[in-house]
């Protein structure tokens, strides 16, 4: 039996997000977030996993990640359980 091969478009995690974050997705090489702008528009933001050095903390439904620039990336998910699932999926690919 052969192992399943993951390409860079295999979806590992998806959540509807909360607040400004409308859609949060984890792929094997990146995190994609659909954010709501201040004037009602939406734009996609991509954070590559090679730039993430680890998870700083989980506070409620917010996940704080450390990146190579020593700044925090914050992702607001729909619930605390989804935040923990986000971190578990992130640890699986890092």
Model features per residue range: what roles?
Residues 2-19, 32-35, 39-94:
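Acidic, Ser/Thr- and proline-rich intrinsically disordered linker/docking segments
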